[in-house]
Amino acid sequence: MATLLVATAVAFVYTEKLKLTPSPILGTRVDKVFSPVCECDTDTATISLRLRRRDRLTVDVIDKDGDSVRTLIQDSPTSGGRVSLHWNGRDDSASIVPEGSYRPRVHLAAERRTIVLPNPIRVDVTPPSVELVSVSPRVFSPDGDGRAEKVVARYRVDERAGVLLYVNGERRVRKRGQQKTGRIEWFGRLDTEPMPPGVYRVSLGARDVAGNLGPRTPEKAVVIRYVALGRDRIEAAAGAPFAVLVLSDAAKVEWRLGKGTGMARPGTLRLRAPLQRGRYTLTVTANGFSARAAVVVREPRP
């Protein structure tokens, strides 16, 4: 009985001494989450710590049951100071560990201490899923006049992730933040220059905090249109009136036909054909972008 009491007292004194002794480890920095399969900047976890003094260091990674899955270094002499290690999410047999939470365990031989760091590392290999809820407007014009300058895509993601917008299969926009719902905008420009008129295919993707890149959404078509005409060939008698539809979101457009010029609002443009028969070009311009139609003028019927 006396022996047991002595042993208990010794253990108590040792425990109290450990409480009063400064930790041999400080300045711990451990990545919180990563994906060993993402093939990206976050496909490894960094475990960084600072030792107060030289020692022989063993660091392994343990699972939720406290079992070691990977030994990173073993009985390695260190001179103290900063130590940084990297874990690629694989166990000692080079297999990727199951998803879940892991923690670094540090053994200091000279100190005769083993410390489990209170820094969980989450292994996540499941990619996020993003839904493209809507795209509007479907026709826009990035010409700088403040009217219909951009496309807005609204989305939902099944986990917190950064959303990416692709145009014709190429990534054009990366949304800051990691909201599960929101909107992402495309201004129809390459660098600072507006892109040519035409049909463009828009889709979304998402990359989660761990780095997993999810599949892209089905594509939706949007149209960049600065100005367009309802017809590309117009036939009219000399001096006769004719009309052509002008499509543009500009406040006004400028037209030119032969020696005649003028300003008009988009919509139905009503003009008169030149008095001389021949082939002319009708040019309609909005904010520096033009559309053209051939105007064939024939002799008036007798």
List PLM regions with ranges.
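Hydrophobic membrane-insertion alpha-helices, especially the h-region
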Residues: M1-E16
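Flexible, low-complexity linkers/stalks enriched in Thr/Pro that connect modular domains
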Residues: T15-T28, R112-V133, N212-G230, R292-P302
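Extracellular Ig-like/FN3 beta-sandwich strand-entry sites
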Residues: R54, R82, E99-R103, R160, ...
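Glycine-centered tight-turn motifs at strand-turn-strand junctions
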Residues: S68-V97, E170-G198, G260-G278
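Conserved structural position at the C-terminal beta-strand
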Residues: V106-L108, L204-A206, V284-A286
